[in-house]
A protein has these predicted regions:
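N-terminal glycine-rich phosphate-binding loop and ensuing alpha1 helix
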Residues: 2-58
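Conserved N-terminal catalytic core of the sugar/cofactor nucleotidyltransferase
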Residues: 34-101
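Short glycine-rich anion-binding loops that position phosphate/pyrophosphate groups of nucleotides
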Residues: 10-13, 55-57, 82, 109-112, ...
C-alpha cells in the first residue's frame, strides 16, 4: 500500500496569522491544506492519507474532509510539539493501520504545489531504493543596502 502522511500541525507563528493557522488560510475560497490533500486524493497510486493536525483544529479538519469529499483520509491524529514529533505521530498511526511493507510518503500540508509526477516518482524510488526525497533548486534574492559592492562578489 502507498500511504501519504500529511503533517499540518503547525500554528503558523512565523507567518503571524491572527485568526487561524496558515494551513487553513484560503486561496480562491479553499484552504491551502485542501489543495494539498486533493493532490494525494486524486493520485491513483495513493491508497490512504493520514492527516496530522493541531488537536484543537481536528474537528474543523473533519468538516473540510467531508465538504471536499477527501475519502482517502483514513485517520486524523494530533500533532506533536514540533514538526518532527508530528511526523512521528503520523508514521506511528500508519504503522498501526497498514502493513509494514507499505510505502509512506511524508508531505507538508502547506505545500500544495506537489504534482502527480513527483508523487509517482517518489513511490517508484522508494520501491526501488528504500527511500526518496524531493528537492528543488533554491532561488534566493540578495538585498544589500547603503553600500556599493563589486558585482563580481555577488553570486
Amino acid at each position: 500500500m502507498n500511504i501519504a502522511v500529511i503533517f499540518a500541525g503547525g500554528t503558523g507563528q512565523r507567518m503571524n496569522t491572527k485568526t487561524k493557522p496558515k494551513q487553513f488560510l484560503e486561496l480562491h475560497g479553499k484552504p491551502i491544506l485542501v489543495y494539498t490533500l486533493e493532490q494525494f486524493q486524486m493520485h491513483n497510486e495513493i491508497d490512504a492519507i493520514i492527516l496530522v493536525m493541531l488537536e484543537s483544529w481536528i474537528g474543523y479538519s473533519r468538516t473540510l474532509i467531508e465538504r471536499y469529499r477527501l475519502s482517502k483520509v483514513a485517520a486524523i491524529v494530533p500533532g506533536g510539539s514540533n514538526g518532527q514529533q508530528s511526523i512521528y505521530h503520523g508514521v506511528k498511526k500508519a504503522a498501526e493501520l497498514f502493513p509494514m511493507e507499505s510505502v509512506v510518503l511524508i508531505h507538508d500540508g502547506v505545500r500544495p504545489l506537489i504534482d502527480h509526477d513527483t508523487i509517482s516518482r517518489n513511490i517508484a524510488c522508494v520501491k526501488k531504493n528504500g527511500s526518496a526525497i524531493t528537492v528543488s533548486p533554491a532561488i534566493e534574492t540578495t538585498v544589500i543596502k547603503n553600500t556599493f559592492r563589486d558585482r563580481k562578489s555577488v553570486v
